């Protein structure tokens, strides 16, 4: 009988809300694969005093749960914290985007340096896209490419009118979905609005539905099925989960070349990669919106389905657990 692997996720931020929802959903997928997962939410990443308190809380969790593997779901301070607070436990780090390609501010550069140092401490490195892996200063060759993944049973196509009925939307309007998240400046909401205004000069009955961090995650599948198109204009991305969710629902996507969007949209009908220019975006939006045709993006869901990603992570965890078991006679630390 194979005993389940015990994995402790380290996730930045509070447990509530939509922040890092993809990490929590990944834990659910792993549980379905037989992995025993516990979640530790790192509440503060800036205050040394709070980090010291969090370290004590984290060590108590490690002692009580006794994980075979620790998985940090972000770089920067989150990954360094996991490496420092439990140095004898095998560590997996998933780099997700702004931890390796953040803003060129003092804080952004510091975060990138912390991420690069943390990469030296990891037993396994996961990057959500090839483009992000290229940002590593070292250990690129050993880093695994695994997007966050989406649940194909949660995100699946259904008639647009049914989704609109649940949301209370008009059946006649054209709706462009835009994910502003917690950082509208990086997502380039300004560019999206400029492109939409130009498109409104070409089409009538058009509006934008902007998603922010306050949108309940359970509502997102309905939004994907109710909208006519997803627009993505970000300056920086890792592997935007919103693109994967849209593809799983056959929602047409118009996106700039950022993160792994070119790879994700390659061969998908009724979707396009566009220059980061409002006029070019407007022309493509108008083309897609004139005919209410869905994409065939669901044909690609096998590349990023949650069960496939969970299976790959299970393999990594079991390798690390086996290595730790072999070394256990030499390690008496509870951390």
How would you label these PLM feature ranges?
Residues 267-279, 286-290:
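Conserved acidic donor-binding segment of nucleotide-sugar-dependent glycosyltransferases
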Residues 8, 169-187, 193-196:
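Conserved donor-binding/catalytic core segment of Leloir-type glycosyltransferases
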Residues 235:
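Aromatic "clamp/platform" in nucleotide-sugar-dependent glycosyltransferases that forms part
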Residues 93, 116, 120-160:
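Donor nucleotide-sugar binding/catalytic pocket of nucleotide-sugar-dependent glycosyltransferases
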Residues 72-78:
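Short His-centered aromatic/hydrophobic patch
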Residues 243, 252-255:
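Short hydrophobic beta-strand element within catalytic cores of glycosyltransferases
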Residues 222-227:
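Short alpha-helical donor nucleotide-sugar binding micro-motif in glycosyltransferases
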Residues 69, 85-102, 125-126:
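Active-site proximal beta-strand in glycosyltransferases
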């Amino acid at each position: 009988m194979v005993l389940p692997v015990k994995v402790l996720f380290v996730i930045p931020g509070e447990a509530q809300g939509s922040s890092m929802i993809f990490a929590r959903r990944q834990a659910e997928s792993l549980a379905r694969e037989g992995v025993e997962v516990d979640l530790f939410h790192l509440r503060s990443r800036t205050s040394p005093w709070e980090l010291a308190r969090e370290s004590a809380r984290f060590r108590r969790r490690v002692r009580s749960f006794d994980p075979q593997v620790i998985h940090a779901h972000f770089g920067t301070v989150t990954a360094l914290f996991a490496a420092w607070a439990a140095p004898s436990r095998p560590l997996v780090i998933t780099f997700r985007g702004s931890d390796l390609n953040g803003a060129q501010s003092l804080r952004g550069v510091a975060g990138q340096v912390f991420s690069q140092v943390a990469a030296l401490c990891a037993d396994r490195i996961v990057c959500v896209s090839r483009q992000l892996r290229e940002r590593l200063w070292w250990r690129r060759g050993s880093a695994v490419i695994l997007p966050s993944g989406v649940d194909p049973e949660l995100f699946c196509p259904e008639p647009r009118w049914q989704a609109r009925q649940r949301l209370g939307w008009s059946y006649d309007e054209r709706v462009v979905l835009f994910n502003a998240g917690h950082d509208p400046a990086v997502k380039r909401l300004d560019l999206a609005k400029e492109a939409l205004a130009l498109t409104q000069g070409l089409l009538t009955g058009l509006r934008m539905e902007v998603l922010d961090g306050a949108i309940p995650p359970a509502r997102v599948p309905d939004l994907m099925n109710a909208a006519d198109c997803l627009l993505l204009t970000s300056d920086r991305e890792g592997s935007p989960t919103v693109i994967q969710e849209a593809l799983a629902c056959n929602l047409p996507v118009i996106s700039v070349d950022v993160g792994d969007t070119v790879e994700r949209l390659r061969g998908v009908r009724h979707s396009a990669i566009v220059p980061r220019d409002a006029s070019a975006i407007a022309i493509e939006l108008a083309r897609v919106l004139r005919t209410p045709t869905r994409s065939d993006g669901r044909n690609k869901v096998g590349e990023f389905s949650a069960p496939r990603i969970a299976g790959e992570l299970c393999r990594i965890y079991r390798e690390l657990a086996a290595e730790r078991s072999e070394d256990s006679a030499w390690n008496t630390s509870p951390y």
